Amino acid sequence: MSKRHRLDLGEDYPSGKKRAGTDGKDRDRDRDREDRSKDRDRERDRGDREREREKEKEKELRASTNAMLISAGLPPLKASHSAHSTHSAHSTHSTHSAHSTHAGHAGHTSLPQCINPFTNLPHTPRYYDILKKRLQLPVWEYKDRFTDILVRHQSFVLVGETGSGKTTQIPQWCVEYMRSLPGPKRGVACTQPRRVAAMSVAQRVADEMDVMLGQEVGYSIRFEDCSSAKTILKYMTDGMLLREAMNDPLLERYGVIILDEAHERTLATDILMGVLKEVVRQRSDLKVIVMSATLDAGKFQIYFDNCPLLTIPGRTHPVEIFYTPEPERDYLEAAIRTVIQIHMCEEEEGDLLLFLTGQEEIDEACKRIKREVDDLGPEVGDIKIIPLYSTLPPQQQQRIFEPPPPKKQNGAIGRKVVVSTNIAETSLTIDGVVFVIDPGFAKQKVYNPRIRVESLLVTAISKASAQQRAGRAGRTRPGKCFRLYTEKAYKTEMQDNTYPEILRSNLGSVVLQLKKLGIDDLVHFDFMDPPAPETLMRALELLNYLAALNDDGDLTELGSMMAEFPLDPQLAKMVIASCDYNCSNEVLSITAMLSVPQCFVRPTEAKKAADEAKMRFAHIDGDHLTLLNVYHAFKQNHESVQWCYDNFINYRSLMSADNVRQQLSRIMDRFNLPRRSTDFTSRDYYINIRKALVTGYFMQVAHLERTGHYLTVKDNQVVQLHPSTVLDHKPEWVLYNEFVLTTKNYIRTCTDIKPEWLVKIAPQYYDMSNFPQCEAKRQLDRIIAKLQSKEYSQY
């Protein structure tokens, strides 16, 4: 009706069309306004529902996070401010808001933050991710028991299987304990027998504590200190803590000291136990925890006055053991063959861990495995081969934690193969390992005090080591261990436990350090396993000949200075004495080169080219001066990586040597020892360097007999020059850096010297009245007679 009425009006009035058009527009506008209003209402409702869901999610997340934090002994989170809070609240939490916005963009629910007590910043999301994994470690169930024992006892023993989490979690709980005490905050030290473990564990714990490595958490190894004044938890090699004790005998900066991997019974750990046992008596506020991965803890308990024991079981799965029916003639060949067979034939996923004895063997195996897998063609699964040994740089050590390659489309399994020294036995845990290949060998230090020879020999491992290796296969699920030796050999030929290092080492450095610590009565020092008296006497004799101890066995001023250098006594003496021969710069460089891994690279496929490259650096007088030539050439070529590659030189070794040299230079500066050089054009330039070498190594000399072989001076051991020497002739008298026991007796890193220097520089040692009869004695007698008759006024 109204519609017709309006239309009628339109027909009656001339302006009706215009008015009808305007009314239509109004109606459209009203409808649009109404639609927009409805959309806004719907949007508001949807937003309200989403906010409610977000609040519910946040509440659930906070509840689960709080449960996790409370179980971890940390304070629960408080409710976060909403996005629509007041301006002042917004500004107060600007850091958190910005972080939440970022998290929102990333598609994550905003997590309420609690403040990191070490940085005073909110914890990062990664902290909570890591915390969830930490709480799953077996050790967490024992936190309350651990804290109770820590509070009530000054020292105790903790046994936890590899992978239980003891190395990463226990030190953090000790930090919490130290922070809860009133008064000045002392730090926590955790010693490791191996540098790789000290570095990689420190990095992991820094991540877990949400701090920068080198700040609140740091590490200290020989020639490298990654810590600061802020460091409250320091991982270090056992030798470094012993060195700290020389300048701080009561270790006052620490409130808790943890000796980790004590079952390895390294030389430094054994000495530290004796030192700490005495320190604990003088410092009632010091806590000492001895941690071991094996169950023979009774000996440690008895040693520390029947202290308590806390045992933490690991989470291990069954491991199937396979033996070879017959002994393997070439264990390296057998190991490589086993890796290939497992990779090709095993149908279940899982990574491999192969134990070998040293860097050269590991590098060789990695190359050969890669080459053989590449030759198998594209149908075989991808393989990622990762070496692991102590001299690898930290970033390369971290590769062991990388995931394996993915499966191929044809279903072929990708695997990670870690080829490691015995560091992977207990020091580091590598998740994902299901197959272990154990050839049954490791390099061990062996010392013969009668002939004063210490060597690294490839020897059979103990049953305890074999069990630890097998256990690596059962960390995440049931595994398999392939032992490349017979079951009979395991049962009848292997020792039960590894022989403590103190019973098979040259104790020169140890005795020097103990003397520096003020421990003079070595016979009554509380060793857990006392070394043989002959070994101790040899060490005292060496230090007396080097003038580090006087005839009464007391530390001399020179000996006190030598103890400050992180070097063997012979090297330390050589560095200090080089100042008297105007060649301390050059001797510093040689010492640095001797302190790092072999600098010459000799790949199997390019041995001839590598040998030719080495001879370009060769010095006519021998290997020490050849090392000096390499270092000088490296510096002159601006430390170029390409130059190293072209000349078959290990770049990492040279960079390490440069770092070592700088540290030794700083120690020299501290004692005001002049750093100088003889003029290069002088004929005495190389003579002075060779004389300086004699000041440290006059006890390591060999004489060429008429029969054509060398005899070591005094000890009369038949030896040969090592094939790696650059000497192209046989000098009558040579000084050597090390005695190598293999199929033959070799002397390695040799330099041509003059016999006159020996009797002039070390007359006490070259006293002919107690020298055995030999060609060398007869010749030295003649030289001494000539010197005494003034025929030689110069030498």
From Swiss-Prot:
The modification Phosphoserine is found at S15. Its EC number is 3.6.4.13. Pfam families: DEAD (PF00270), HA2_C (PF21010), HA2_N (PF04408), Helicase_C (PF00271), OB_NTP_bind (PF07717). GO terms for cellular component: nuclear speck; nucleolus; nucleoplasm; nucleus; spliceosomal complex; U12-type spliceosomal complex. GO terms for biological process: antiviral innate immune response; defense response to bacterium; defense response to virus; mRNA processing; mRNA splicing, via spliceosome; positive regulation of canonical NF-kappaB signal transduction; response to alkaloid; response to toxic substance. The modification N6-acetyllysine is found at K488. Changing V523E: Abolished interaction with NKRF. ATPase activity is enhanced upon binding to G-patch domain-containing proteins. G-patch domain-containing proteins act like a brace that tethers mobile sections of DHX15 together, stabilizing a functional conformation with high RNA affinity, thereby promoting the ATPase activity. It is an enzyme of class 3 (hydrolase). There is a cross-link at K786 (Glycyl lysine isopeptide (Lys-Gly) (interchain with G-Cter in SUMO2)). SUPFAM superfamilies: P-loop containing nucleoside triphosphate hydrolases. A motif (DEAH box) lies at residues 260-263. Gene3D superfamilies: 1.20.120.1080, P-loop containing nucleotide triphosphate hydrolases. It catalyses: ATP + H2O = ADP + phosphate + H(+). PANTHER family: ATP-DEPENDENT RNA HELICASE, ATP-DEPENDENT RNA HELICASE DHX15. This is ATP-dependent RNA helicase DHX15. It comes from Homo sapiens (Human). The lineage of its organism: Eukaryota, Metazoa, Chordata, Craniata, Vertebrata. The gene is DHX15.
